[in-house]
Amino acid sequence: MSDKKSIWSTVDHFLTKTRKIIVNSVTALILIVITFSILGGVGSMFTSSDKIDTQDKVLWFKPIGVVVDSEVPGSGSFDIESIIASGGDQVEQHELQDLLDVLNHAATDESLAAVYVNVSELGMYWSSAFKIAEAVKNIRDKEKRVIAYAENYSNNSYLISSQANEVLISEYGQVSAFGFSRKREYYKDLYKNLKINYNVFTAGDFKSGPEPYTRDSMSENDKLAWNEFANPMWEKMTGMMETARNLTEGTLQNYGDNAWLMFTDNPEGAEVALELGLVDMIVTKEEIRSWMYEQFPNEDEDKYAYPDRVSIYDYLSTIDDKSDGVKSNNKIAVINVEGAITTGEVAFGVAGSDTIVDNIQAATQDDSVKALVLRV
């Protein structure tokens, strides 16, 4: 009997020891895998294996979407035309400072072969267009080659593109830098014919807001106010365009005033732009690929492909942000208010009052914030 107990005791001891060895081995293996995974992740943060190569490449500055002061994550456009144009997808938002950082850094980056600019699909306010145009001009002034192309040029896109060394246009394109316009609908006669009575209370001479309900045309005061705003803006814009293109003062104004006559004589808008010196070359999509291959051959030696290039945000990732980790007890808080002010949260094109109030309260409660800028 004692011999049987001894055998079972030995077997039990062996199984127990074996189980401990297996469990400990598996545990150790799991810990080793986790440890190496963590070390590998940390190491990848400091290695340059994913470093963006910019040597002899063309910075491809072709943002599509809209320029904003501050991106609203996960928010699409509420503009019907934008939704239709984008096929229902959310509109891509590009922060102005990111675009300026890319262009300003490219101006002194000797590794880049050139900068290609195409902003024909980028929506922006005039103030943003002026800043981007100045950044492109700075690149050209630093003797870095800048090539601009678009199928069609609007006021803003031509302002930016005109600062390039070479301006190209599609053979079916047109420069539509005709100046500013403003259109309003007036309902006074409509309501009168529909026999709808309403009351509008106004005070002051320059109160044009309710004019669509009180007039059937633009008032002289409204015309005066608009011209006081638009004329200096247009003069600055045409001045930058004409200086960059070495055009005689008044060329753009004459083009805008008489474009319909010019197009009557020659319906090819691209040819008219070339004759006036607004552009340097008319190209098809195939021709621009071939032309750029001659200027900047790609590694694959494919003359039908665009040159070796680096995108905006890949290039942005190579720029060191010197402000990272810098702490200050004297800060200036900037709160951006873009779009129509309504109740609720901020969304693209909507300045939600709840979010604005929360941001203001957060700034006032931060002792390190010494001033507040409300950018509307």
Regions found by a protein language model. Name each.
Residues 2-262, 293-376:
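Small-residue-centered hinge/linker elements
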Residues 168-169, 279-285:
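Short acidic-hydrophobic, aromatic-tinged amphipathic segments that line or gate anion-handling sites
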Residues 265-268:
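Extended, domain-scale alpha-helical bundle/helix-rich regions
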